[in-house]
Amino acid sequence: MDEDAESRVSSTRSYDRRGHLDWLRKLPDSLLCQVFLNLPTKDVVKTSVLSSTWGNIWRSVPGLDLGYGDFPEYNAFVSFVDSFLGFNSESRLQNFKLNYQYLRLKYEWKWTELDNANVTRWINTVIKRKVEHLHLSDVTFSNPESVSLPCVKVMYLDMVKFANDLAFEMLISGCPVLESLTIKRSACDNVDYLRVCSQSLLSFTLVGHCNEDMVKEQVVAIDAPRLEDLKLYCHETASFIIKNPASLVKMDIDIMFNLSSEQKFDPNDLPKRNMIRNFLLGISGVKEMEISSHTLEVIYNYSRCERLPVFRNLSSLHADFDDYRWEMLPGFSKTPGEEPISILPGPQCNLPALEFVDILKPMVEKETELKLMSYFLEKSTILKKLTLRLGDFRGNEESALLKKLLTIPRLSSSCQVVVL
C-alpha cells in the first residue's frame, strides 16, 4: 500500500472514531446513562476524559459495578462507594454489584465487623433507592432481625457467607418480587439446609462448592410454584426436595446426591431411595432437560431397584452419556400406562413430543448406536431432525454404515437425518 493510500485509510479510521464519538456526545444524558449501565464503573469513570460534558455523568449512572484492581487501597474503595451512593440519593438504582473477593485477595485483609457494617449500610442505602439487580461476591451476612428488598428482581450470590440457615432463608423471603436467583456456594457458607421459598421466582441456578471433605449432609429445599427454569450443578448436596414443581419447563442437572466412587448408591438406604424417587417425580413434567453422565449413573443405579417415572412432556433431551448407558434413553420417554420401565429399549412405545435429536458424540460402536438411531427414527412421531457425527471409519465401513442408516424406517415423514 502506497503512502497516499495509507494516509487515506488512517484518515478514514480517525474520522470513523470521531464520528462515533460525536454521535455519542449528541445522545441525551438519560440515554447515555443506560448505555454506561452495561459497563464496569471503572470504565464509565474513564469516559469523563472523552467529553467536557461527561465529567460527572458517571455519578448519574443507575448502577454500580466494582471489581478487581479498581482501587489502590481499601479505604479508597469504601470512600468511593459512599460517595457514589450519596450522589443523587433520591434517584432509583437499577444494579448494585459488589465484589469483595478480589479486593480481599489483593490486599490480604481479613473480614471484620467494620466490613459487615459497611455492607449492611450500603445494602440499606440501595434498598432505599429501589435497587432491582443485586450482585454480591464474598460478603458476609450477619444474623438480621428482618430483611426487606421490595424491588429486587435479580440476585446473584457468589461465595456469600451467612450466620446460619435462617439468615439465608430470611434474605430470600425478604424479596417479594424476586424472579432470578443464582447462588455459587462456598464450602464455609454456614448453610446446611438451604431453603429457597419464593412465590415469584422464575429461574434458579445453584452451583455447589468443590469441598469433598464435607462431613455434614447438606439439603436443598425449593418451594417456588412459579419456577420455570432450574439449574443444579452440585455433587456434594445429599438431598434435594422440590415442592410445587408443576410449572417447571427447563432443567439442567449435574448432581450426585453426595455419592461418589467411594460412596456408591446403596439400594438398602431407603431414605436416599425415597428422596431420589420424589426428586425424579418432581422433575418428570419438564419439557427440556440437560443431564450429566454423573447424574445418569446415579439414576441408572437407582433404576435397578425402583421404577423410573414417566417423562411424558419431554421434547428436548441433551444427555452426556460418557462411554456407557446409551440404553437408558427410552426410560425418559415412555408413554403412560405401560409396564414397569425396562432399561433396555425393548418395549413398543412411541415418542410423541420429540422434535430434534442431536447426538454430539461421534459414532464408534456401529451396532449399539445403530439401535439408538433406530429407536429415535422408528418411535418419534413428529421428529423433524436427527443430527449425528461419525467417528474414524474406513471408507468402506462408513459407506456401509450410511446405507444402514438410510434403510431405517422413519415414523415421521418430515424427519431429516443430517450426518456431520
Curated annotation (Swiss-Prot):
InterPro entries: F-box-like_dom_sf, F-box_AtFBL13-like, F-box_dom, FBD, FBL13/AtMIF1-like, LRR_dom_sf, LRR_FXL15/At3g58940/PEG3-like. SUPFAM superfamilies: F-box domain, RNI-like. Residues 21-71 form the F-box domain. Residues 341-390 form the FBD domain. Coiled coil: none annotated. Transmembrane segments: none annotated. Pfam families: F-box, FBD, LRR_At5g56370. This is Putative FBD-associated F-box protein At1g78730. The lineage of its organism: Eukaryota, Viridiplantae, Streptophyta, Embryophyta, Tracheophyta.
